[in-house]
């Protein structure tokens, strides 16, 4: 072995022992005729001192991030020199020999200083030597182990599903891989293991899980990755309560890795209530500021802006003192989200209403408004009007922004909820308008995905009354982040074909894209359901980090580029020829 102890393990009880450490030079300090280094490895840091002879002479060549092995005697630090900030702070190693295992070139950035993200990603192997990035990756491993432990205890089978499959319409663009042996044909990287895990239920596996890599070729979005990880689970012969209860066990074990005892069972809120009260299907419950319905209140208003299908409000406590420039900034906030602006009323200290909206209201509307919305003198009341979905989305975003500006969010709090009773379908036009992808060519598209089972009450009528149909779907939300989503699945061919038809997927297309699944359903498919957790997001929350890039060993930049390897990159003419990427498909090709 190149070392006998790890740097972070030394304690006063080890005094007098001869040890060999190996790691990196985190810092070097020259104190007259003595050189000190902080030697870092994965376990922590120990101070090493070079006092005399040849070993002191050798130490003069050490620089930051040299990889070294040191042998020496563990000693108690002189009085007054202890460092209470580190576990090894009471001891040091008096070096008797030094071996340089690897020299370091001049660093592109100092590891103990702030560096730009581009540099950090380009030299990610250096970035991961730092405490916070390195610990985030180690935490991820602990989280994986915690989840596996729970699932193993419930007789789950860990099964790997293919990462080279066929392209199916799942809501985002596929990454395509040319099939060299069938020129003109392509594999697709999976957006999720959805279809394969359902087939595993048909196969009688009953309890499946996988820490699965998924791929989606999406447009630039600030905190998305083209490849990401899910904890994917599926179970046969279960209802929604069974899936949610087991999911809660997994979450409790995962949050225990940071010392938090998650109280169970977790609360539940219906999709309709979440949208009505919080303007979001992933509500942040760490603070109040609920939306207030004002549609009926303004039913007879002469103010044209409020003559809309929906009018709602959210109150900003103390917001009446905002300067005009700040209030104008709220208009820009709304425009960035696709709205014309954000109406507001200021409540004076004497209760008088001012602002551009107030003058357009009737005396009766002004008289009762503060009581209706729950505002106090000194508050600002923001309004949105339009379709319920659009206006609530703006108010929900405003609610979050108000909470941030007023420092209402406890950063140490954990607020979980299940969102249940989801609509089975949404208008394809509304889905597209809000930035989602509408699968199929019909007027309606699946709210979750096409394989989500309707509730028993909606099964007979979902294709004649799609706007009222509910699905057996459930999302788990933590601190305003969707961290998992699942549902009971369709397991009958006739129901699945009706859903496809509802979405405008023709029988021919359904057979072409999903024929293997439809056929499987004819061989005694069991009722089944499952869930997929956004593993990157969960680990980021646990680590207290804002971006999922921080918890991925080698992430892509926001534009999907890897600064380290410079991927994606052009291919050679020979590779292009061999791949058959330019070949025209045969008669049976896609």
Swiss-Prot record:
Residues marked Important for tRNA non-discrimination (site): 31, 80
Keyword Cytoplasm set for record: yes
Enzyme class, UniProt record, top EC level: ligase
Catalytic activity: tRNA(Asx) + L-aspartate + ATP = L-aspartyl-tRNA(Asx) + AMP + diphosphate
Binding site for L-aspartate: 170, 216, 448, 489
PROSITE patterns per UniProt: AA_TRNA_LIGASE_II
UniProt entry keywords in alphabetical sequence: Aminoacyl-tRNA synthetase, ATP-binding, Cytoplasm, Ligase, Nucleotide-binding, Protein biosynthesis
Assigned GO CC terms: cytoplasm
Region annotation Disordered: where it falls in the sequence: 559-590
EC number: 6.1.1.23
Region ranges (Aspartate): 194-197
Binding site for ATP: 216-218, 225, 482, 534-537
InterPro entries attached to this UniProt entry: Aa-tRNA-synt_II (IPR004364), aa-tRNA-synth_II (IPR006195), aa-tRNA-synth_II/BPL/LPL (IPR045864), Asp-tRNA-ligase_1 (IPR004524), Asp-tRNA-ligase_1_N (IPR047089), Asp/Asn-tRNA-synth_IIb (IPR002312), AspRS_core (IPR047090), GAD-like_sf (IPR004115)
Main location group: cytoplasm
Highest taxon in the source lineage: Bacteria
Subcellular location per the Swiss-Prot or TrEMBL entry: Cytoplasm
Compositionally skewed regions (Basic and acidic residues) per UniProt: 575-590
A GO biological-process term: aspartyl-tRNA aminoacylation
The keyword Ligase is annotated on this UniProt entry: yes
Molecular function terms, GO-annotated: aspartate-tRNA ligase activity; aspartate-tRNA(Asn) ligase activity; ATP binding; nucleic acid binding
Family of the protein in this entry: Belongs to the class-II aminoacyl-tRNA synthetase family. Type 1 subfamily.
Complex and partners: Homodimer.
Protein name: Aspartate--tRNA(Asp/Asn) ligase
Protein source organism: Mycolicibacterium gilvum (strain PYR-GCK) (Mycobacterium gilvum (strain PYR-GCK))
The gene coding this protein: aspS
